[in-house]
Amino acid sequence: MICHNQQSSQPPTIKTCSEGQCYKKTWRDHRGTISERGCGCPTVKPGIHISCCASDKCNA
């Protein structure tokens, strides 16, 4: 599986993942809306929105 792997302020990259899922999570803080993409489907704290998916590059 290929997932986007990126922090908000970084250029987008892709990564081959063994977890079988990709995620995209977003939240707001004093800097504005922050997003993060990667492999797997982590548990998140309240106030953080997460979307998990199971196809190549689905977390664009």
UniProtKB/Swiss-Prot annotation:
Keyword Disulfide bond belongs to the record: yes
Tissues and organs where the protein is expressed, per its UniProt entry: Expressed by the venom gland.
Any one Gene Ontology molecular-function term assigned to this protein's record: acetylcholine receptor inhibitor activity
Localization, UniProt: Secreted
One GO location term (cellular component): extracellular region
Main location: secreted
Family indicated by similarity: Belongs to the three-finger toxin family. Short-chain subfamily. Type I alpha-neurotoxin sub-subfamily.
Function (record text): Binds to muscle nicotinic acetylcholine receptor (nAChR) and inhibit acetylcholine from binding to the receptor, thereby impairing neuromuscular transmission.
Protein name: Three-finger toxin Mnn I
Organism: Micrurus nigrocinctus (Central American coral snake)
